[in-house]
From Swiss-Prot:
The enzyme's E.C. designation: 2.3.1.30
Record field: catalytic activity: L-serine + acetyl-CoA = O-acetyl-L-serine + CoA
Domain of life: Bacteria
A Pfam cross-reference name: Hexapep
Gene Ontology BP annotations: cysteine biosynthetic process from serine
Swiss-Prot/TrEMBL keywords: Acyltransferase, Amino-acid biosynthesis, Cysteine biosynthesis, Cytoplasm, Repeat, Transferase
Organism: Staphylococcus aureus (strain MSSA476)
Associated pathway: Amino-acid biosynthesis; L-cysteine biosynthesis; L-cysteine from L-serine: step 1/2
Name of the protein in question: Serine acetyltransferase
Gene (UniProt): cysE
């Protein structure tokens, strides 16, 4: 009964978060994120029973069919909604709270080869937009929004909005921090580096830089 209630809650979460959802049958049969979460429930139970090979086998089969990789050791709360889902990776020591929404291409990963706790903790009511990377043993507190393609390497307080590379807070407790910011103005480090090199080359042509190489 507990499992059935959880599955009903997961389906309800899909309808709340995705306006494209039309029917319960459609959600159950076609939503890969839902399939990945339900497969993880089985894999995680086996993992806790120290049946590691069976747990990993289920997680890998799920990844093959859904494109979503959730390590069986990860601890996931209620009503996790993974939308689109392709390319999502959730690491072994990651914990995720309740009512969390994750979009495609998100990585909740580590930063190196260290053992032990090495993945992020995600609080309740968190939204992580497409392509974002949350890395390391950090805490993303409750009611946080993380913008698309952001790279978050430090803990984030509750009621914050984070964007950019590296991620920085642009809104906290409903108040903007610094200048107005939206996804159209996300920093592009590659473009900035190219512009820097162009400026250096221009200085070389004008005789302002005499060295044979540019740093």
């Amino acid at each position: 009964m507990i499992l059935l209630k959880r599955m009903r809650d997961d389906i309800k979460m899909v309808f709340e978060q995705d306006p494209a959802a039309r029917s319960t049958l459609e959600v159950i049969t076609t939503y890969a994120g839902l399939h990945a979460v339900w497969s993880h429930l089985i894999a995680h139970k086996l993992y806790n029973q120290k049946k590691y090979v069976a747990a990993r086998a289920i997680s890998q089969i799920s990844r093959f069919f859904t494109g979503i990789e959730i390590h069986p050791g990860a601890k996931i709360g209620k009503r996790l909604f993974i939308d689109h889902g392709m390319g999502v990776v959730i690491g072994e020591t990651c914990t995720i709270g309740d009512n969390v929404t994750i979009y495609q291409g998100v990585t909740l990963g580590g930063t190196g080869k260290e053992r032990g706790k090495r993945h992020p903790d995600i609080g309740d009511n968190v939204l992580i937009a497409a392509g974002a990377k949350v890395l390391g043993n950090i805490k993303i507190n409750s009611n946080v929004n993380i913008g698309a393609n952001s790279v978050v390497l430090q803990s984030v307080p509750s009621y914050s909005t984070v964007v950019g590379i590296p991620g920085h807070i642009v809104k906290q407790d409903g108040v903007r921090v610094g200048k107005t910011f939206d996804h159209r103005h996300l920093p592009d480090p590659i473009y900035e580096q190219i512009k820097h090199l162009e400026r250096q080359l221009e200085k070389t042509r004008n005789g302002e830089i005499q060295d044979d190489y540019i740093i």
